[in-house]
Amino acid sequence: MSNNEIVFVTGNANKLKEVQSILTQEVDNNNKTIHLINEALDLEELQDTDLNAIALAKGKQAVAALGKGKPVFVEDTALRFDEFNGLPGAYIKWFLKSMGLEKIVKMLEPFENKNAEAVTTICFADSRGEYHFFQGITRGKIVPSRGPTTFGWDSIFEPFDSHGLTYAEMSKDAKNAISHRGKAFAQFKEYLYQNDF
């Protein structure tokens, strides 16, 4: 592995494309370039509401699978409904799989409060075996599905600062500028450019 290679553990092709777009954008910082390597490992998901604990469990599994000394990161995303005290949270993937987008929207139908927050938590294990966390949060509301339904729950989440568009209706660059994932990876990218890893 070269000095600036890091491994991203994900089997989600859409997530990989989005992260590549964010992390590999040119940054004028000591001519440092990040080389992203993808590993699609099958990691067990800790069932918990603590997003750092979930990300750390996945990070430790990734280090165990790939071997110590390789900079590696994992990412976990949650969708928290205000009306449900933060649920489904990290369980959103399972809600999507078992219910689908339409039924998730219907869950909030009886309630006036449709507000939610999208959260991305990154766990990065550096080459020294130290773990670092980065988190991005975007506030918004749950709406009936609009736009392409090819990327998780993007078509039902309308950020407050999106001018009335769901994530799915936004351009990639516009979404990355305000999204939970974009915010978390902006922090992570800054860390990578300022530190040896």
From Swiss-Prot:
Note: Present with 3490 molecules/cell in log phase SD medium.
Catalytic reactions on record: ITP + H2O = IMP + diphosphate + H(+); dITP + H2O = dIMP + diphosphate + H(+); XTP + H2O = XMP + diphosphate + H(+); N(6)-hydroxy-dATP + H2O = N(6)-hydroxy-dAMP + diphosphate + H(+)
Cellular compartments annotated: Cytoplasm; Nucleus
Subunit record text: Homodimer.
EC number per UniProt: 3.6.1.66
BP-aspect Gene Ontology terms: nucleoside triphosphate catabolic process; nucleotide metabolic process; purine deoxyribonucleoside triphosphate catabolic process; pyrimidine deoxyribonucleoside triphosphate catabolic process
Disulfide bonds, paired cysteine numbers: none
Alphabetical list of PANTHER family matching this protein: INOSINE TRIPHOSPHATE PYROPHOSPHATASE (PTHR11067:SF9), INOSINE TRIPHOSPHATE PYROPHOSPHATASE/HAM1 PROTEIN (PTHR11067)
Function: Pyrophosphatase that hydrolyzes the non-canonical purine nucleotides inosine triphosphate (ITP), deoxyinosine triphosphate (dITP) as well as 2'-deoxy-N-6-hydroxylaminopurine triphosphate (dHAPTP) and 5-bromodeoxyuridine 5'-triphosphate (BrdUTP) to their respective monophosphate derivatives. Xanthosine 5'-triphosphate (XTP) is also a potential substrate. The enzyme does not distinguish between the deoxy- and ribose forms. Probably excludes non-canonical purines from RNA and DNA precursor pools, thus preventing their incorporation into RNA and DNA and avoiding chromosomal lesions.
The organism of origin for this protein: Saccharomyces cerevisiae (strain ATCC 204508 / S288c) (Baker's yeast)
Similarity comment text for this entry: Belongs to the HAM1 NTPase family.
Keyword Magnesium: yes
Cofactor binding note: Binds 1 divalent metal cation per subunit; can use either Mg(2+) or Mn(2+).
Cofactor: Mg(2+); Mn(2+)
CDD domains referenced in this protein's UniProt entry, alphabetically: HAM1 (cd00515)
Keywords, comma-separated and alphabetical: Cytoplasm, Hydrolase, Magnesium, Manganese, Metal-binding, Nucleotide metabolism, Nucleotide-binding, Nucleus
Positions of transmembrane segments: none
Protein name as catalogued: Inosine triphosphate pyrophosphatase
InterPro entries named among the record's database cross-references: ITPase (IPR027502), ITPase-like_fam (IPR029001), RdgB/HAM1 (IPR002637)
Pfam name, any one: Ham1p_like
Binding site for ITP: 10-15, 58, 76-77, 93, 151-154, 175, 180-181
